[in-house]
Amino acid sequence: AFPICYEIIKNYNKGKPKEEHFKGIYGTELTLVDDSADITFRAKDDDLRNTTYVVFDTETTGFNAGGKDQMIEIGAVKIANGEIIDRFDDFINPGRPLPQKIVDLTCITDDDLAGADNEANVTKRFLEWAEGLPMVAHNAKFDMSFVDMACKKYGLPEFSNTVIDTL
């Protein structure tokens, strides 16, 4: 393994100034962390230790927010001082049967959605409930793509909250 590591480092350093050279420390195991990845977007100066924030997730009919897919559930909690102070959980009726792969993935069925409101109304209620608070989600870009598309599709105000991605 050392000869392979040596060759990789030698090729990486080729043509770089000496102060930018990478040096291997043989006999150690290191983990490289990509600290350049953006985990926050639409950022404002929010300190989650001192503010109320929302943790949320969406379930959808598929993976294409800009295509035929849409949200089928928005679930969220408001957190203040480390405690849940409020909850939001609404199913959304997509007006068509769910694909079986989505039923298998989410355990949400057509029967669950039968009496649910439409995407426009649920999204509007969610925006009002979130009231501009910072938002936290795992794989937030996916969830926000559906929220943003719903806002655009139904003429709702643009969602401009700070968003933090835990992925």
Task: Enumerate the predicted regions with their spans.
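Conserved non-catalytic scaffold segment of RNase H-like nuclease domains
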Residues: 49-160
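Phosphodiester-processing cores and adjacent nucleic acid-binding clamps
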Residues: 1-59, 78, 129, 140-141, ...
